[in-house]
Amino acid sequence: MKLLAGSFAALFLSLSAQAADCTFTQLEIVPQFGSPNMFGGEDEHVRVMFSNEDPNDDNPDAFPEPPVYLADRDSGNDCRIEDGGIWSRGGVFLSQDGRRVLMHEFSGSSAELVSYDSATCKVVHREDISGQRWAVDKDGLRLGQKCSGESVDSCAKIVKRSLAPFCQTAKK
């Protein structure tokens, strides 16, 4: 019985440490050399690629057409995200360990933050942020309402949330 209790305690501590270490860094999405309609960003763990479907826009602020391509360097897996709304170019973040990609997706008046497993493209967590200003930083997720400007700092009401749900195990 002590062995079982010890195993549960170790699992709990491991999950708690994972949640506590859940931080995301914004990924700069830039034009890819040699391919005028491809944009992407990368770090040592993962590469994220978008296709720009508008040949007249060489500096898009969003990518309206799936898929998004993920190349996970740690596992060697590549995958495609086929579902999604419009992906915001400035709304792509990577987890510190490279296992999660967090993206801002929107369509019409609805908006979500969605995290994906970088090796499988499975959804880890999604959060509806419709009608709110948002920011991801070292302190977590900040959501603002009653805003006078475009940034979350212009909001009269700001709620802080943990990023831990975005780092959990991918949903099946």
Curated annotation (Swiss-Prot):
It comes from Pseudomonas aeruginosa (strain ATCC 15692 / DSM 22644 / CIP 104116 / JCM 14847 / LMG 12228 / 1C / PRS 101 / PAO1). Keywords: Disulfide bond, Signal. Disulfide bonds join C22-C167, C79-C121, C147-C155. This is Immune protein Tsi1. The gene is tsi1. Forms a heterotetramer with Tse1 consisting of two Tse1 dimers and two Tsi1 dimers. Formation of the complex inactivates Tse1 enzymatic activity. Immunity protein that plays a role in preventing early activation of toxin Tse1. Binds to a large surface of Tse1 and thereby occludes the active site to specifically inhibits enzyme activity by forming a hydrogen bond with the catalytic diad. Residues 1-19 form the signal peptide. The keyword Signal applies.
